[in-house]
Structures are given as C-alpha cells and as structure tokens.
Amino acid sequence: MERYESLFAQLKERKEGAFVPFVTLGDPGIEQSLKIIDTLIEAGADALELGIPFSDPLADGPTIQNATLRAFAAGVTPAQCFEMLALIRQKHPTIPIGLLMYANLVFNKGIDEFYAQCEKVGVDSVLVADVPVEESAPFRQAALRHNVAPIFICPPNADDDLLRQIASYGRGYTYLLSRAGVTGAENRAALPLNHLVAKLKEYNAAPPLQGFGISAPDQVKAAIDAGAAGAISGSAIVKIIEQHINEPEKMLAALKVFVQPMKAATSS
C-alpha cells in the first residue's frame, strides 16, 4: 500500500502524472508475459495493473477477453499467476503492483487467504471489478488486514453518497471510469472528469487514475489536465500483444514505442 503513497509523492515532486499499463498475467505464455512486464517498466510504467485470467470477465471488452483466452490456452493457472507476481516483485522492489480481478477468484481461495497470498507476494492493491462498494466490506476488511489497498471504481455518474463511500473505503488510488460500459481502446474516453476529480479531492479520496478507453498520449494529458493523478491503459496495450503474437521480439519493441510517449505525456 505504501508503494502508492511514495510513488505519488515522487511524481508530484517531478511534476508528473502516473502512467499505468494493464496486461493479463500469462498472456500469451508465462515467459513472454514476464518479458512484456519488464519491457513496460523499462519504457516508463510507473505502476502495474495486472489481470488474473478468469473464465467470465464481465467488464472486459473483446480485446482483454482474448488475452484471457490466450493465457488459458497456455495453461496458465491462478497459482502460476501468484508465482509470476512473486518474481515481478523480486525484480522490481519499488513499483506498485495492482490486481484487477473478479470476486469468484477471490472466493475460490477464501477471502482472507486470497489477500494473505497477495501480501506474501508483494501485491499492493486489489480491485474486484464485480463487487460494488456497498457489498465490499468483507473484501476491504481482509485487504486492510493484509496491508493491501482496496481499490474502488468511481463511475462518471457517481452521486455524492457514492463519492463519499469511495473516498472513505478506498486506499492506494481511485479508479476513475472515463465512461460506462466495457473496456476498449475503440471507445475513446469522453468528457474530462474535472467535477468528479474536484469532489474526490474534497472528500480526501486516494489519488484518481483515469481508465477505460485511454489509447493515445493526448488522452493521458487530458486526464492529467482534468486533475487526475494519472491514466491507466489496457486494451491498447493488449492489442499490441495480439498484433505481434507470433513475433515476440517485435511485440516488445512495439510495446516500448507505445509506452514511451504515453509516459512522456504525463509531464506538465
């Protein structure tokens, strides 16, 4: 959890926002997935948002569903994902690592056991995509017991009550939704969310990172101009993996070319 705090403090000092890529662990196979993550960090990623392959991903658009299918095809299991997380943490001791998951994967292990395992491998935050704030008590309590930040999604139409709850229960960062619907780079992020950002600040919420539909540097800049602490980009990155599925070296080079200008756009 503390890794987010020190990251945001360092970025503030450097007058930068955070650029956070999302990928699915084990896509397209364990070895290449670890290389992808190293490449994203080398290219300037400030934190990582990682998915564990799950058979029924509700909030994911087709691009990320395909990533899950590729990981399944490679035989990747949740247990192997945790082994990967331990390796990533060993190699990169300071970068914040977040998981984006679904409740079933947490239930399968037992809620407390799941967060204990997160703590053990060095995961900093967990966002359970299909658990709304009002049903989150057992998850967020277990998370805090194990020094893992519970992350909440703030939708564009959030009312005051929801904003207060998110501010009060969330830690690490707040996942600011650019728009309603499923993830995807095709649907570019719409309106700047200054009003939500202002409200979240007023209620002392964890720093907001804008996600969903972030696929170009100008959108990263717009998110930061609207007051967000940074931006999360998933589908656009996973699409690059898909496009170069049979050319592992080209894939890594293309990821670098994509991430560098996205990170550069976070500087004011």
Swiss-Prot record:
- Pathway where this protein functions: Amino-acid biosynthesis; L-tryptophan biosynthesis; L-tryptophan from chorismate: step 5/5
Which chemical reaction does it catalyze? (1S,2R)-1-C-(indol-3-yl)glycerol 3-phosphate + L-serine = D-glyceraldehyde 3-phosphate + L-tryptophan + H2O
Q: Which stretches are transmembrane?
A: none
Q: Which GO terms describe its cellular component?
A: cytosol
SUPFAM superfamilies in UniProt: Ribulose-phoshate binding barrel
Give, as one word, the top-level EC class: lyase
Instruction: Please tell me whether the keyword Amino-acid biosynthesis is annotated for this protein.
Output: yes
Q: Name one Pfam family in it.
A: Trp_syntA
GO MF, any single term? tryptophan synthase activity
What the entry lists under PROSITE patterns is as follows: TRP_SYNTHASE_ALPHA
- Give the UniProt keywords, A-Z: Amino-acid biosynthesis, Aromatic amino acid biosynthesis, Lyase, Tryptophan biosynthesis
**Active site, renumbered:** 49, 60
**What EC number is given for this enzyme?**
4.2.1.20
Give the protein's biological function. Answer: The alpha subunit is responsible for the aldol cleavage of indoleglycerol phosphate to indole and glyceraldehyde 3-phosphate.
Subunit details: Tetramer of two alpha and two beta chains.
Family, according to the entry, reads as follows: Belongs to the TrpA family.
Q: What is this protein called?
A: Tryptophan synthase alpha chain
User: Species name for this entry?
Assistant: Shigella boydii serotype 18 (strain CDC 3083-94 / BS512)
